[in-house]
Amino acid sequence: LMDMLEAGQIDLMPNISYSEERAQKLLFSSNPEGTERYYIYARPDRDDLAKGDPQALQGLTIGYNPGVMQTFVGQQWLTNEGIACTYREYDGDSVLFDALANNEVDAVIMNDTISSPSASPMFYIGSSDYYFAVPKSRPDLMNDINAAMTAIARVNPRYNDEVKSHYSTQNSGSSSLNGPERS
């Protein structure tokens, strides 16, 4: 889809993370559409990870989606924490959570807009803003988007948060009890 957007075959895409490389090919809205938070998720019964010690991730297999901001941020966080782990690539969010549920991986790197009953966020690893993006050939459309976003923000400064809360799958985690709660 990104190739189609860059080529002008798609006029508008929401939820695009900004990068210098992308800014050479696309126009981004002046203000963010929202903020995405990134986590390392694991099965709810992983009491060893629920204690909050990143070193518990040492040697584990961690699933990720290729070419997305959360993977870059997550792998950088793991490196900064001194974690040596094995990475396994999966195409698609549902495939990634299925791999976690089926014990193919010990944990996954994912954003906060996707949820699964077989996954609980264990470690907050970072965040980034996301934007509306249009092809460079459509500055007229970007001007309209920026004007609309400004008008909305003037009326309701929390509009973006409300939309995200209403339409994204908020991770309610699992209804499973962890070790201390079971005691």
Region spans (language model):
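Acidic, polar ligand-binding/catalytic clefts
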Residues: L1-A56, M110-S127, K136
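Extracytoplasmic small-molecule ligand-binding "clamshell" domains
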Residues: L1-E20, Q24, Y64, N80-G82, ...
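Sec-exported extracytoplasmic/periplasmic mature domains
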Residues: E6, I10, I62, Q75, ...
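Ligand-binding cleft/hinge of the Venus flytrap
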Residues: S29-N31, A56-Q58, G67-E89
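Extended ligand-binding regions for polar small-molecule ligands
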Residues: P44-Q70, G126-S174
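Alpha-helical transmembrane signal-anchor helices
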Residues: S174-S183
